[in-house]
A protein has these predicted regions:
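Core RecA-like ATPase module of SF1/SF2 helicases and allied nucleic-acid translocases
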Residues: 14-17, 25-114, 119, 123-126
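Interdomain hinge/linker at the junction between the two RecA-like core domains of SF2 helicases
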Residues: 1-11
Length: 126
């Protein structure tokens, strides 16, 4: 991957949505063509769409340059920037299946990778 090292953004649970909005705005200001917020599940993707005020649940469409989708739908895709939502131990545990999903998520980024956390990161990232 070309670009900057991964950036870790930490906040408490109540502040994380605002931090996500700030991060998305900062990334959009860099004029990347493709930005993805990658979540562990479809339910989390729906939560993030709500935070970003994306009302259309069609995860295959870009909305204001940002796509929100669960990790299972990212395989084979690439994005200029990936924002990984809550890659903590409860979502990506230390087992082969979770390791593969996390690997897929973090390797979708061509130029920038941002990790949004309200807990300690998955041990797979350490």
């Amino acid at each position: 991957r070309h670009g900057l090292p991964p950036e870790i953004h930490r906040a408490n649970t109540a502040s994380l949505p605002a931090l996500l909005l700030e991060t998305v705005a900062a990334v959009k200001a860099k004029n990347f063509e493709t930005i993805a917020v990658v979540c562990r599940t479809e339910d989390e993707a729906a939560e993030v769409r709500s935070i970003l005020d994306i009302t259309d649940a069609d995860s295959s469409a870009f909305h204001n340059g940002v796509m929100v989708l669960p990790v299972m739908l990212t395989k084979g895709l690439e994005f200029d920037c990936v924002i990984l939502w809550k890659p903590d131990e409860s979502r990506y545990g230390n087992n082969p299946r979770e390791a593969k999903l996390l690997y897929v998520a973090i390797t979708r980024a061509l130029h920038e990778l941002h990790l949004m956390l309200d807990a300690d990161p998955s041990s797979l990232l350490l």
